[in-house]
Amino acid sequence: MSETRMAQNMDTTDEQYLRLIELLSNYDSTLEQLQKGFQDGYIQLSRSNYYNKDSLRGNYGEDYWDETYIGQLMATVEEKNSKVVVEIVKRKAQDKQEKKEEEDNKLTQRKKGTKPEKQKTQSHKLKQDYDPILMFGGVLSVPSSLRQSQTSFKGCIPLIAQLINYKNEILTLVETLSEQE
């Protein structure tokens, strides 16, 4: 009787070790993808800086940044089935600052007695679909290498969340395996 229980215990332990090896393999391959994405992004960024060296502002950097820009993506941390899961989601269209601006607009419209509804919907749409690369020169004047750099860096965002999830799952599996021994 104890031999069958021991065999079943070994089977579950073996499955957990196999799962750990699989998670480590996935973590390693995802880390290589992240490294490749960052490498490509920085190479393209250096190319765009090289082609932009003769401009008045110099390299693409903090001088070009629009400080009022609010990001489009947001990381959420949830607990599902006693596991901490990190997900990347799109930010909601309106933030607190925009709501305050709308309230101020309503007050000024009440004083004036006008209702420019078309202007509101157009400005709201622009804020929602704003591409941050436009702060580096507009639609037509952004170098293709800078666009490729943006694409490489955007591709890294889900990989980072995936790496965090793998790491959390590996840590919980290692804890359960150490408790069993």
Swiss-Prot record:
Signal peptide: none
Record keywords, A-Z: Acetylation
InterPro entries registered for this protein in UniProt: Vma22/CCDC115
Region annotated Disordered, chain positions: 93-125
A molecular function GO annotation: unfolded protein binding
Positions with biased composition (Basic and acidic residues): 93-107, 114-125
GO biological process: vacuolar acidification; vacuolar proton-transporting V-type ATPase complex assembly
Gene Ontology CC: nucleus; Vma12-Vma22 assembly complex
Name of one Pfam family that matches: Vma22_CCDC115
Note: Present with 752 molecules/cell in log phase SD medium.
Summary of the function given for this chain in its UniProt record: Required for V-ATPase activity.
Protein name per its UniProtKB record: Vacuolar ATPase assembly protein VMA22
Gene: VMA22
